[in-house]
Amino acid sequence: MELGSADAFDRMGTLGVEEEFYIVDADGRPTSGIDDLVYGPEPPEPLAGRLDHELFQFTIETQTPLIEDPDEAGAAVSTVREALVDHAAAHGYRIAAAGLHPAAKWRELDHATKPRYQAQLDRIQYPQHRNTTAGLHVHVGVDDADKAVWVANELRWYLAPLLALSANSPFWNGFDTGLASARAKVFENLPNTGMPTAFDDFEEFQRFERRMVEYGSIDDRGELWYDVRPHTGHGTVEIRTPDAQTDPERVTDFVEYVHALVLDLADRYEAGESGTSVRRELLDENKWRATRYGRDTDFIAPDSEGVVSLVSFVETESDRLGVDGLRSLLDAESGTAVQRRIHEESGLDGLCEHLTLD
């Protein structure tokens, strides 16, 4: 049974960034490529040991090295991305980035043969068979297991605004879904996804994790795919909400804010602050608003007394935490709007080209 330990939570403020991408052909269309890029010759640094694939043979994931200084996160993300693009090009492929690839038709694409994924396909069936999603996952190290659980609980309200700012997947299976983040809704069809409930402490979380494995609900702890989770292997709090981003600067902006927010919440835990009691239904409603409308919505306040606009959220959080990236995200055209505009102007071919990273 693969379970983590409270001992893993021993470093505060370190960073790790995981990004999921699409392998595409010369025309920017999805194509199987993991045999060459993951299982072929050893990839160059900094990809060695930090390159894997996902459920489909056209999905690939990178991990940054451990980042000690948050100011170096942007360079780390760019270095890994550039190495992936070069690695793909050396084998005749290109790389694309979005929450969903607009030209990916899951019935026509091959699943990976890794036993772990084959077991998931057999157990979960239809929801996993069509899971062509790609996300951005940010890990922040936390130096105490109970603190990590408390921070993860508190982070839940902030996830909907983050999804709204990251929304980058209006198209799925070849059509416009009308959603800002169709990825969020496609992924939520899987078990053990979406907004988790709060846990009292690490012991309760680990007991839940253990029972899910013991009772056969999951094969390992990595199959708890909630929007935020204490990662009992890495000793981090992992935010999994954002869509994959085409622009690396947007990734850096998200990382800056998530890092500052986790450190702020950790300080509040140390100061003895009581946790915020927020109804799961309210959190789900806020996430739905972000999924459907992206930036064009308000969010129900944590105390359910009134709503918070995205502009107000960005201004308040930017000033409170001293970060600039949130304003940059808000000021730029959203990924969803860009995709729809390019699709209108240049069709699917133009959109596929836009999403490539070279």
UniProtKB/Swiss-Prot annotation:
It comes from the Archaea. One of its GO terms (molecular function) is ATP binding. Keywords: ATP-binding, Ligase, Nucleotide-binding. Its EC number is 6.3.2.2. It is an enzyme of class 6 (ligase). It catalyses: L-cysteine + L-glutamate + ATP = gamma-L-glutamyl-L-cysteine + ADP + phosphate + H(+). One of its GO terms (biological process) is modified amino acid biosynthetic process. PANTHER family: GLUTAMATE--CYSTEINE LIGASE 2-RELATED. Catalyzes the synthesis of gamma-glutamylcysteine (gamma-GC), the main low-molecular-weight thiol compound instead of glutathione in halophilic archaea. Belongs to the glutamate--cysteine ligase type 2 family. YbdK subfamily. This is Glutamate--cysteine ligase. It comes from Haloferax volcanii (strain ATCC 29605 / DSM 3757 / JCM 8879 / NBRC 14742 / NCIMB 2012 / VKM B-1768 / DS2) (Halobacterium volcanii). The gene is gshA.
